[in-house]
Regions:
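Low-complexity, intrinsically disordered or signal/transmembrane-proximal segments
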Residues: 5-7, 11
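Noncatalytic, beta-rich nucleic-acid-contacting surfaces in large DNA/RNA-processing enzymes
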Residues: 12-579
Length: 579
């Protein structure tokens, strides 16, 4: 099989037992194809390359098992995430809708003859049907399939709380407490803390990992809920296949809006969608609505679905590091694109180019950087020799230990965000009706309710009471209000030069720890219907238990986005703001 070129070419050579067995395996795969392989040389060569790897690593059963699961759930919409979209065989078998030839994705991230571990296939289903999919699998393969477990370990906070309980504290513990305030001996409590840290606290369910075994499992290993009482490390030596059956609220939202349009059927270019994304008008767009994504969309001004795909990869830590991010925004050129590690596949291509190896060996070095394998990293640096950009390359690849995306995953996620943005641009009511059901993002509840009201929807009626018409009372009790007007009294007022004073309702926030061990707090405030401002506060700021932030800052402008750099501020409960 060393010189395998195409399925047909191999058939003519099937004269010895090895070739006959290989042909049988290829026939098993091709019989499950749901698409016809194009005749162009790049497709035929890629197909031959993948067949050779699959057969040499004996992965035929795995691919057929994934196809069996999809056949079992063909009436349920799905979307494959992860690196499966790197494989032409996966595309032809209908496991993924990403064509790796069209998207120029090397297969090494998914299939690599230098590795003997199974490739990873993750399948997204609507979140409300995840359990149904799992139950179908358990029913189809009883005793041979089970959900994997996670061990929950004691960390700093949980160990501290457990120590307090073991030393006699009853009832709820404050979010921030000291042992002294509870009348507990701190020396003994800290001794218990140290003993607990890193120990098992309990067993939980994996978010979606399903194990498929070739033989019956001992009943002692399986719980009543079909959960194997082992974690991913403990099952490593057992003969099994693993597939992740995951839930995706964005997919649920899109299907709710229009179940007839497939994800890959949305137009790649649409002026209204591009305009919406360029304004950063992405509230309610699941997985694309964070403040960072809003700013990124304003910066790059997506003109197509391809740009949206690019943005989903660029926002990840691997691509969004300091100088490279700033340089990318200021130099939006093809040369700059090829010079930056945006997706993990870019690292493979870059490594192969730098040291003159094939993509498979390059992927092993990529994995070494991602897993912090110092011996393998040093081997790569030695092969790099006296390259003039050696230090820059090392810093760039070191960032692979952060959370990045392979290009195939970015394609699927970017297409989902583009499709949701398309629906928001063309079907506001349908979009917000689905968003209220499925979009559970990081914004406060009132944000989604307010945006839905602006789109013409009437959200669920608030229970009748003698204070029914008071929006502030409704906000305190329910987290939102029914009046179409915004809560009164919030403002931004220009003082002088770049100074501005503000008061707004907290919509979203997050505290980040920078590389210099300093903290920065990002907060989004609502000022009026459809009017939000972003704040940066150069310290950890206790916003989460309050409602309003009021203060003074400097107005800043960067990459088509305005924000306020806070000079002084105070955080208030809503009662105090109105008193």
């Amino acid at each position: 099989m060393k010189n395998l070129q195409t399925h047909k070419a191999t058939q003519s050579k099937g004269k010895n037992m090895e070739d006959v067995k290989a042909l049988e395996q290829i026939d098993r795969l091709t019989s499950r194809f749901t698409r016809t392989c194009p005749s162009q040389p790049e497709y035929q060569e890629r197909l031959a390359e993948e067949f050779e790897i699959i057969l040499s690593l004996r992965f035929t059963d795995y691919f057929c098992q994934i196809r069996d699961i999809l056949d079992l759930t063909q009436d349920i919409p799905h979307m494959t995430r992860g690196s499966a979209g790197s494989s032409l065989v996966c595309y032809l078998m209908g496991i993924t809708d990403v064509n790796p030839i069209e998207w120029d994705i090397p297969v090494a991230r998914f299939l690599n003859p230098k590795r003997d571990d199974l490739p990873d296939v993750d399948i997204d289903y609507p979140h409300y049907r995840q359990e149904e999919v799992m139950n179908r699998i358990f029913k189809k393969w009883p005793g041979k399939s089970a959900r994997i477990s996670n061990y929950v370990l004691y960390q700093d906070k949980s160990a501290k709380r457990e120590a307090a309980k073991r030393l006699g504290h009853k009832g709820r513990l404050p979010r921030k407490f000291t042992y002294e305030s509870l009348g507990i001996d701190p020396v003994e409590a800290k001794r218990i803390e140290r003993k607990l840290k890193g120990k098992k606290k309990c067993i939980s369910k994996h978010c979606g990992g399903i194990l498929m075994f070739t033989r019956q499992l001992p009943k002692s290993l399986i719980s009543q809920t079909n959960q194997i009482l082992l974690d991913k490390n403990e099952v490593a030596d057992l003969e099994h296949l693993k597939v992740d059956i995951l839930s995706n609220r964005g997919l649920s939202q899109l299907i709710d809006i229009d179940p007839q349009i497939k994800l890959f059927e949305y137009p790649e270019i649409d002026e209204a969608t591009s305009s919406l994304l360029s304004r950063g008008d992405v509230l309610g767009v699941t997985q694309g609505e964070s403040p960072a994504m809003r700013r990124l969309f304003r910066a790059i001004r997506p003109q197509s679905m391809l740009d949206c795909v690019f943005a989903t990869a660029l926002i990840r830590p691997v691509a969004m590091q300091g100088r490279r991010k700033a340089a990318f925004f200021s130099d939006w050129t093809a040369d700059r694109v090829s010079d930056v590690v945006v997706c993990e596949d870019d690292a493979i291509v870059q490594i192969a180019k730098l040291i003159g190896c094939d993509f498979y060996e390059a992927d092993m070095y990529r994995r070494a950087f991602a897993k912090k394998n110092e011996e393998k990293v040093m081997e790569f640096m030695t092969r790099l020799g006296d390259h003039p950009r050696k230090d820059e390359v090392f810093r760039s690849l070191q960032e692979l230990s952060g959370f990045g995306l392979c290009r195939a995953h970015a394609v699927n996620l970017g297409r989902l965000i583009w499709a949701l943005a398309y629906q928001k641009a063309h079907n506001q009511k349908g979009f917000w009706s689905a968003a209220l059901k499925h979009c559970h993002g990081s914004y406060k509840r009132w944000v989604y309710k307010t945006e839905a009201k602006r789109a013409g929807l009437t959200p669920t009626t608030i229970s009748k009471s003698d204070k029914f018409d008071d929006p502030v009372w409704q906000y305190k009790k329910y987290g939102w209000w029914s009046d179409p007007k915004f809560l009164p009294g919030f403002y931004t007022r220009h003082l002088y030069l770049d100074r501005i004073e503000f008061a707004g309702l907290i919509a979203n926030g997050r505290v980040y720890k920078a590389g210099n061990k300093k903290y920065v707090t990002f907060v989004t405030l609502g000022i009026d219907n459809g009017y939000y401002v972003d704040l940066t506060i150069n310290k950890p700021f206790p916003y989460s238990d309050h409602d309003v932030i009021r203060g003074v800052g400097r107005i800043k402008h960067l990459n088509n986005s305005d924000y306020i750099e806070v000079i002084e501020s105070e955080v208030l409960p809503i009662d105090k703001f109105y008193s």
